[in-house]
Amino acid sequence: RFKKIRRLGALPGLTSKRPGSGSDPKNKSRSGKRSQYRIRLEEKQKLRFHYGLTERQLLKYVHIAGKAKGSTGLVLLQLLEMRLDNILFRLGMASTIPGARQLVNHRHILVNGRIVDIPSYRCKPRDIITTKDKQRSKALIQNYIASSPHEELPNHLTIDPIQYKGLVNQIIDSKWIGLKIN
């Protein structure tokens, strides 16, 4: 993970660690003019590693975004941001997106009162995301909420930390997307 972060820059969804000061002598020899191919590849890899997608999954999202009305890039980012694992990460119920994926896979999360065990589940406006009533599920979420730094919550989400409940108000606005893509 740290190699990826060093190469691509900070990826908040992958890990909370930050790259070093940049005094790596190997890196200086590789600097120079970056080709268009390299720039596009790095931006694509940022998306893949940040959201934890395979190449095939990303291509499928690009295909869906291309068919939709509006800017393909913006629609793609909206699709990725509305995934259940990413929404759990944005709500602060998990420290990283892989951590959120694990919570979903282990069946700790309910969407509108139903267990959802698919991390790529596409949330819609007015979806209510809660934890299972089991003590273990609530304890896991409580630890994440207590330990996470309270960053500003995007305006398309609201959270009730006492009931461990999140609400999707609307589709994400472009200014709230946490990843800087060129």
Swiss-Prot record:
GO biological process, one term: ribosomal small subunit biogenesis
Region Disordered, residue ranges: 8-36
GO molecular-function term, one example from the UniProt record: structural constituent of ribosome
Protein's cellular compartments: Plastid, Chloroplast
Claim: Lipid metabolism is one of the keywords in the record: no
Record's keyword annotation contains Metal-binding: no
Domain S4 RNA-binding, residue spans: 82-143
Keywords, comma-separated and alphabetical: Chloroplast, Plastid, Ribonucleoprotein, Ribosomal protein, RNA-binding, rRNA-binding
GO cellular component, one term: chloroplast
Family matches, as Gene3D superfamilies: Ribosomal Protein S4 Delta 41, Chain A, domain 1, RNA-binding S4 domain
Function: One of the primary rRNA binding proteins, it binds directly to 16S rRNA where it nucleates assembly of the body of the 30S subunit.
Quaternary structure, from the entry: Part of the 30S ribosomal subunit. Contacts protein S5. The interaction surface between S4 and S5 is involved in control of translational fidelity.
UniProt xrefs under HAMAP family: Ribosomal_uS4_B
PANTHER family assigned to the protein according to its UniProt record, in alphabetical order: 30S 40S RIBOSOMAL PROTEIN (PTHR11831), SMALL RIBOSOMAL SUBUNIT PROTEIN US4M (PTHR11831:SF4)
Family stated for the protein in its record: Belongs to the universal ribosomal protein uS4 family.
Protein name: Small ribosomal subunit protein uS4c
Highest classification ranks of the organism: Eukaryota, Viridiplantae, Streptophyta, Embryophyta, Tracheophyta
